Design a protein with these regions (language model features):
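Rossmann-like dinucleotide-binding cores of NAD(P)H-dependent redox enzymes
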Residues: 1-3, 7, 74-75, 80-84, ...
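A short alpha-helix-loop-beta-strand transition element characteristic
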Residues: 16, 53-55, 138-139, 194-197, ...
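A conserved short coil-to-beta-strand element within the FAD-binding core of flavoproteins
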Residues: 16-30, 140-153
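Glycine/serine-rich phosphate-binding loop and adjoining beta1-alpha1 elements at the start
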Residues: 19, 25-66
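Core beta-strand elements of the Rossmann-like FAD/NAD(P) dinucleotide-binding domain
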Residues: 36-45, 163-172, 210
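Glycine-rich dinucleotide-binding loop and its adjacent helix/turn
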Residues: 48-105, 109, 134-138, 189-210
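FAD-site-proximal beta/loop scaffold in flavoenzymes
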Residues: 63-80, 168-242
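Flexible, glycine-rich terminal cap/loop adjacent to redox cofactors
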Residues: 242, 259-269, 274-372
Length: 372
């Protein structure tokens, strides 16, 4: 149902949909190979939007049965008794929390000393505490050195930063150490298109590659690998091709972890502001003090807003709690227009709603929150 709507949109907008594997023949031509054979197509412009795929590691060979990527994890036919998630990032924690709720004993192994390193540190600590309450276990500062698959499970050898070795058995292992751009098999090097050291396509501010007629957007170009970022780039790219002047503010692309509770963020973290020596203020408000959160049995978490000490302009915001992904949109909008915490504080928010927590966090920048 989710994907069939795309086919409808193709028909509605009179777009020809070709199914097959494509690669460049030259700068103006692609070859499409399908079950019906091969055919070349020429065009004035091309947009490469081939997405990304899970990073593979030789020591952890994926078979999508016992050692799986996020794709394989969604196709498991039964709930594994034990699941090891390799990587404490967004996708691994999302998948791990799902299987934990379904009954798996989930362990997360992460090479760093914290989960989701891009996340605001205070939020990350609260997030891990919440996941631990749900039964997830964490092995931080550990890396997987080898795996051995058998009928009885997967023996996983791990090493800590202090060189201690351990081996444990799991029913299923989920590989989630990041994603890579899907640029292989397109013959990009063959036509002279430039890639960076991570095999992402190099583009300018108008999504144009070093080849005049070829553009690229989404996960195949540098930047966060987020569907909504790719969508914005797709629209902007076509507008550039048609002579318009679109705008994307990459400093305020929201990021959301779809767990329970959700985690949402936009803009700068506290550590980033400290490193940049920016003088800032913090306003926080707990959902425990929000009437709607209490009546829906979701009092966990809080809203955190960071604002410039002098101008009061919002520099970043971080939310952990129910519907965090919905609540962050108001702050993203405010930031897009260069708004301040006072702008949010002065807006009437409906009662009872969890959005009131955003208003109170904004008010608390100056210690004016009412309900705490």
């Amino acid at each position: 149902q989710l994907t069939s709507g795309i086919g409808f949109l193709f028909k509605k907008n009179k777009i020809t949909h070709l199914q097959g594997s494509a690669s460049f023949v030259d700068k103006k031509t692609i070859n499409v190979s399908s079950s019906e054979g091969e055919k070349n197509y020429s065009a004035t412009n091309f947009i490469i939007a081939t997405g990304s795929s899970s990073i593979a590691i030789d020591a952890i060979p994926v078979d999508e049965k016992q050692i799986v990527t996020s794709t394989g994890a969604l196709a498991l036919e039964e709930v594994p008794k034990s699941l090891l998630v390799i990587g404490g990032g967004y996708i691994g924690l999302e998948m791990g929390s799902v299987w934990s709720r379904l009954g798996s004993k989930v362990t997360v192994v992460e090479a760093l000393d914290r989960i989701v390193p891009t996340m605001d540190e205070e939020i990350a600590k609260e997030f891990m505490k919440s996941l631990k309450k749900q039964g997830l276990e964490f092995k931080l500062s550990h890396k997987v050195t080898s795996t051995k698959v058998s009928k009885s499970g997967v023996d996983v050898s791990m090493e800590s930063t202090d060189k201690k070795q351990i081996t444990e058995k799991y029913d299923v292992v989920l590989m989630s150490v990041g994603r890579k751009p899907n640029t292989e098999g397109l013959n990009l090097e063959g036509i002279g298109l430039k890639l960076n050291e991570k095999k992402a396509i190099e583009i300018n501010s108008q999504f144009k590659t070093n080849i005049e007629s070829i553009y690229a957007i989404g996960d195949v170009v540098p930047g966060p690998m987020l569907a909504h970022k790719a969508e914005e780039e797709g629209v902007a790219c076509v507008e550039f091709i048609n002579g318009q002047k679109p705008h994307i503010n990459y400093d305020i692309i929201p990021a959301i972890v779809y767990t329970n509770p959700e985690v949402a963020s936009v803009g700068k973290t506290e550590s980033q502001l400290k490193d940049a020596k920016v003088d800032y203020k913090v306003g926080k408000f707990p959902f425990m003090a929000n009437g709607r959160a209490l009546t829906t049995s979701s009092p966990e978490g809080f809203v955190k807003i960071l604002a410039d000490s002098k101008s009061d302009e919002i520099l970043g915001a971080h939310i952990i709690g129910h519907d965090a992904g919905q609540l962050i949109a108001e702050i993203v909008t405010t930031m897009e227009f260069g708004g301040s915490s006072e702008d949010i504080a002065r807006i009437c928010h409906a009662h009872p709603t969890t959005s009131e927590a955003v208003k109170e966090a904004a008010m608390n920048i100056d210690g004016r929150a009412i309900h705490i």
